Amino acid sequence: MAKLLSKLEETFDFDEDDSIEEYLKGSFHGILDFSQEDISIIRVAMQEINGESDKKLLISRVTDTIINKMEEFFKLQLEKGEIKNVNSKAISVMCFSIIFQSTILWQIYGNSADIDSDIFADDYLDIIFNGIKP
């Protein structure tokens, strides 16, 4: 578990000079490159949700690691004036959700996905930066 958390920390780590595009694309592709063993641990952690709630769930440790790193990144972007004044926690949770769900879909569809992961990442970033309204 410590190895997985360390790998997540590394995947979502950033340099102060990273652009938002570089960071989100790098994080997305970093997760897609996780081994089957890593994904299996996350899968087990997700099954744990229905279990006991009196202990810190494994999935909470996974999500907290990712969301905290992303929130730190977005707070820096706010300070630098790179993004408008938005709730850094909200944008972190939203981006985490998209990356996490995409990872699950890529695991399900594997090489049979009807879209290239680079194109998907570009489209995802386009929606974040430009929205869906005309």
Each predicted region: which residue ranges?
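Short helix-capping/turn signature of helix-turn-helix
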Residues: 46-52
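Hydrophobic/aromatic residues within well-ordered alpha-helical segments
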Residues: 1-4, 27, 38, 62-66, ...
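Short amphipathic alpha-helical interaction/hinge segments
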Residues: 1-9, 35, 39-43, 99-110
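Amphipathic alpha-helical packing segments from all-alpha helical-bundle domains
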Residues: 22, 33-37, 53-80, 90, ...
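C-terminal alpha-helix
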Residues: 73, 127-134
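Hydrophobic/aromatic-rich alpha-helical bundle segments in the mid-to-C-terminal region
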Residues: 56, 78-126
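Hydrophobic alpha-helical connector segments
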Residues: 8-37, 91-95, 121
